[in-house]
């Protein structure tokens, strides 16, 4: 997912891979609702906070959301394999917020895991610093009378989930069009923000 909503599959460049190798990467397994796939997050050592935020969003925020938001993705979970690898990066050279990795383009980690388990493993990547700065509804956010730090935390959590679900839908339903998938993830973002702003800040989200 790009800021302008153009989706591409991207393989990190040589320099980015070399830098990640020098820094090292860590893995974390996330469990959520019983019908939701496990997420195996692979992240750079300086991405610990982003990995923890994704874990909280996927394992706690998403399952606790109201039925209207969750129903947008009712058909998603049965169409995905039991494990989805999520490669976290600060940013992508192409500017995309995330990519889905079609069969044959997975990382060595995902291929090795699929071989060891004996069944399919899906993979996506998320550019967490780019997602942090992404604000798809700036006027609605500005209309909430809250401290900037409070709104930034909520926006980041909602945006992480929206981009995650966007790329997972591309994996599960490769024939669905980008406008259809984008429309659903934007609607999810709006509903997620409305819920979180109401519950955590006691305010209304959006422009009256």
Where are these regions (language model features)?
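A metal-dependent hydrolase signature that marks the N-terminal structural subdomain at the beginning
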Residues: 1-153
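Post-HExxH zinc-binding segment in Zn-dependent metallohydrolases
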Residues: 175-208
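Functionally constrained cores in energy, signaling, and assembly domains
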Residues: 125, 169, 184
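Alpha-helical scaffolds flanking conserved acidic
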Residues: 154-162
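Active-site recognition of the HExxH zinc-binding catalytic motif
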Residues: 162-174
């Amino acid at each position: 997912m790009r800021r302008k909503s153009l989706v591409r599959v991207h393989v990190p460049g040589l320099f980015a891979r070399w830098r990640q190798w020098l820094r090292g990467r860590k893995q974390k397994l996330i469990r959520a609702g019983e019908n939701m796939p496990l997420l195996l997050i692979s992240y750079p050592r300086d991405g610990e906070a982003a990995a923890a935020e994704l874990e909280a969003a996927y394992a706690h925020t998403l399952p606790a959301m109201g039925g209207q938001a969750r129903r947008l993705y009712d058909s998603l979970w049965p169409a995905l394999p039991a494990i989805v690898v999520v490669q976290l990066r600060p940013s992508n050279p192409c500017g995309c917020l995330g990519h889905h990795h079609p069969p044959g383009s997975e990382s060595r980690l995902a291929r090795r895991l699929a071989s060891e388990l004996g069944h399919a493993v899906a993979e996506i990547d998320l550019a967490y610093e780019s997602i942090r700065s992404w604000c798809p509804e700036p006027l609605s956010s500005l209309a909430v009378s809250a401290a900037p730090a409070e709104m930034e935390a909520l926006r980041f959590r909602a945006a992480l989930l929206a981009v995650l679900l966007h790329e997972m839908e591309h994996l599960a339903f490769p024939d669905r069009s980008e406008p259809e998938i984008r429309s659903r993830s934007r609607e999810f973002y709006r509903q997620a923000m409305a819920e979180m702003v109401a519950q955590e800040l006691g305010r209304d989200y959006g422009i009256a």
